[in-house]
């Protein structure tokens, strides 16, 4: 029986392994990576004390992307901005007129995008075109058919409030207790992915008259006539883009 012997050269070739060099971590970094992106700017709108929001029957509409021209973090630095995220934190407190009655109501908050504001903020009735007979029922409102090309509802949230015919300072008799009700509620929302692009005129203020295209409104309406005041703040996360 014959056996074949491997040569030493064959053994040395057999033991050799082809190794591939791993690319360096520096080579994996690409231009425009997350680490290189500028951080979002923040604007905070506070409503408390004399600046609280009064929400009457029929609702209220406020411009919230009020980025004035400037160098601070909350200012726009260019002629165009992109609003990405919004954090909303408010206490809704039923007013004295509403507390006189035992009532419950479903209110609504919307974020509404206005493609062409035209220098003046609209009213909730302009946006939703509700008849007076539905003024107290905002959950039924829809954007006007004639203006659906202009107004776009980005977000919509419902909330419930109630009153029991008493105000918060009333004191129950010693032999009784009153069940708590939702005359004072905390409303919190955080939403992202808005992508609201705003083009600004060549002016320095941040009012609706300075917006050429792309206003963002916060619309709040009480349900069943249960009017209230709003105390808290709205924080907007945005970027300045486009030309100087």
Swiss-Prot record:
Entry's Gene Ontology BP terms: symbiont entry into host cell; viral penetration into host nucleus
A GO MF term: DNA binding
Cell membrane is among the record's keywords: no
Chain location of the short sequence motif Bipartite nuclear localization signal per the record: 1-24
GO cellular component terms, semicolon-separated: host cell; host cell nucleus; T=1 icosahedral viral capsid
Entry keyword set: Capsid protein, DNA-binding, Host nucleus, T=1 icosahedral capsid protein, Viral penetration into host nucleus, Virion, Virus entry into host cell
InterPro entries recorded: Gemcoat_MSV, GV_A/BR1_coat, Viral_coat
Annotated compartments: Virion; Host nucleus
Recorded superkingdom: Viruses
Coiled coil: none
Annotated segments matching region Disordered: 1-39
Entries under Pfam families matching the protein: Gemini_coat (PF00844)
Family statement drawn from the similarity comment of this UniProt entry: Belongs to the geminiviridae capsid protein family.
Assembly mode: Homomultimer. Interacts with the movement protein. Binds to single-stranded and double-stranded viral DNA.
Its job: Encapsidates the viral genome into characteristic twinned ('geminate') particles. Binds the genomic viral ssDNA and shuttles it into and out of the cell nucleus. Plays a role in protection of the genome from degradation, virus acquisition and transmission by insect vectors, infectivity, and systemic movement. The CP of monopartite geminiviruses is absolutely essential for virus movement.
Listed name of the protein: Capsid protein
């Amino acid at each position: 029986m014959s056996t074949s012997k491997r040569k030493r050269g064959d053994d040395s070739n057999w033991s050799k392994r082809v190794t591939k060099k791993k690319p360096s971590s520096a080579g994996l970094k690409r231009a425009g990576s997350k680490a290189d992106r500028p951080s979002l700017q923040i604007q905070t709108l506070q409503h408390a004390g004399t600046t609280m929001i009064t929400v009457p029957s029929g609702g209220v509409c406020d411009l919230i992307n009020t980025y004035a021209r400037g160098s601070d973090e909350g200012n726009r630095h260019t002629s165009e901005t992109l609003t990405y995220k919004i954090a909303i934190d408010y206490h809704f407190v039923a007013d004295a007129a509403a507390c006189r009655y035992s009532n419950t109501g479903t209110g609504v908050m919307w974020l509404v995008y206005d493609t062409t504001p035209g220098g003046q903020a609209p009213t909730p009735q302009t946006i939703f075109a509700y008849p007076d007979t539905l003024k107290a029922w905002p959950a039924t409102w829809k954007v006007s058919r004639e203006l659906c090309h202009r107004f776009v509802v980005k977000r919509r949230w419902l909330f419930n409030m109630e009153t029991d015919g008493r105000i918060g300072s009333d004191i129950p008799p010693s032999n009784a207790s009153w069940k708590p009700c939702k005359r004072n509620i905390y409303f919190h929302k955080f939403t992202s992915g808005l992508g609201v692009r705003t083009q600004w005129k060549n002016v320095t203020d941040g009012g609706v008259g300075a917006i050429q295209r792309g206003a963002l409104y916060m619309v709040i309406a009480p349900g069943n006539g249960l009017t209230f005041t709003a105390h808290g703040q709205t924080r907007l996360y945005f970027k300045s883009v486009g030309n100087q």
